[in-house]
Amino acid sequence: WPLSILSVFVLIHLMEGMGKKESFIISFLYGVGYWLIGISWVYVSIHYHGNIDSLSSFLITLLFIFCLSIYMGLFGILYSYLSFESTKSTIIVFPICWGLIEILRGILFTGFPWLLAGTTISDTFLGGWLSVIGSQRNSIVLMIFCGALSPPIASTAIVINLSIIDFSIIL
């Protein structure tokens, strides 16, 4: 679960100051990685249980991943449309957009509510909320934490990078 949270920090950092097109591309590619890691079991189901050859199973799974990644791309467009250059935007708008896209993904076209971000933290201190508010709302809570912690982490990374550069110059 720590990698899922770290990946959200990276996504927030990459989307800062981007336009709608760039946000779509970044979020879409994030979605490809997200789904590629999370639903590799679909390939196994298609290939072994569906008795379909390896190449066809791979292509079907890849098409499925690209279709699901469109939701993340839509998230990027929605976030870039509603956000403004502020920490409040990251804390408020980012979680709302993420939650709306997860709800949409769970409803539209008979839904595919798998890999909800809220279920990744079921074994953490936030896991107790899972049974009370559900996975989708727990995702929003997780994204609020990610949005709130993102600026301090980004500024720390800048300080670390500058320190490395300074150290390199001194050497």
Report the location of each language-model feature:
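Membrane-embedded alpha-helical bundles of multi-pass enzymes
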Residues: W1-P152, L171
